[in-house]
């Protein structure tokens, strides 16, 4: 559990670079013990519309009005941060093996699979791409 907490804190740091009014408002809402409003969190983004953790799923979550889009991050062989829930590529992409054994350039050649395990046109995004997609929204 301690490792997950540390990873969560480390991953929240880049969001401070992109913090603006929408982020501050959501943070204030979810940390207020007197808040009676429901906060909608899109787990792995809108994975029913597009592959989980894809830019299309993030865009759909925003269009649907989610307050928060929860994403998963893994590190590639060359130290790049990508959106990927699993430690392996097998379930969610057309590739096989551990994310940590692939470079970002190699992962860019793969396609994401949808919830039915069918190949899509979508590619694995980087954390930076996700942050830029959500900035100010």
Feature map (PLM): residue ranges:
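Phosphate-group recognition and catalysis centered on beta-loop-alpha active-site segments
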Residues: 18-137
